[in-house]
Amino acid sequence: MHDKYGPEAKFAVEAEALLPTTKHEEEIARGLELGLPGADSIKDRRIPTFSRGELPHFAGINTFGKAPYVEDVRKCGQYDVAILGAPFDGGTTYRAGTRFGPQGIRKISALYGSYSFELGVDLRESISMCDLGDVFTIPANIEKTFDQVSKGVSHVYASGAFPVVLGGDHSLGFATVRGVAKNLNGGKLGIIHFDRHVDTQDTDLDERMHTTPWFH
């Protein structure tokens, strides 16, 4: 049937057939162990009593992509990718509110599956992810917030995990890059920046903020 829809459909069907299900099966087993087997009336015995995984998308604690929450940040090196929120909007010039960005991103991410039909890749099967929660930002002090974010990112990077930061306003780009750079021993760090503006001012309204991160 997929032949009549063209090569993209053919690729999607064939790629999906080759996907491993190891992580999916491990998540089911973990859910049954930690969340108790489902009630006797539940016919699908893969469903636990307490939600302990990706499903259902409308339930559970809000982490990015329903990844496991890791309270002990010293253990983040056990994962390929570590998510950390940076709820800070003290670097905005005009419109506040992005401090609630990490909450919003986590909430909406629960509605999305991990499989890309275009790429033939299942994120949950390809890498291991965890969510470390949020960096303790300082609303009244942008420089102290930068220090906090840089330390958090540096810790994750040094552990061997890849840090993904959920902001937060644009000023946090500086703190994020600085956190990675601390581990490069003078090596080069590339930046791919998508924005309407280049954000390379020295200062804005006499401060380092959302229009200045790449100057510094």
Task: Name what the model sees in each region.
Residues 2-216:
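Conserved alpha-helical scaffold segments that buttress catalytic/binding sites
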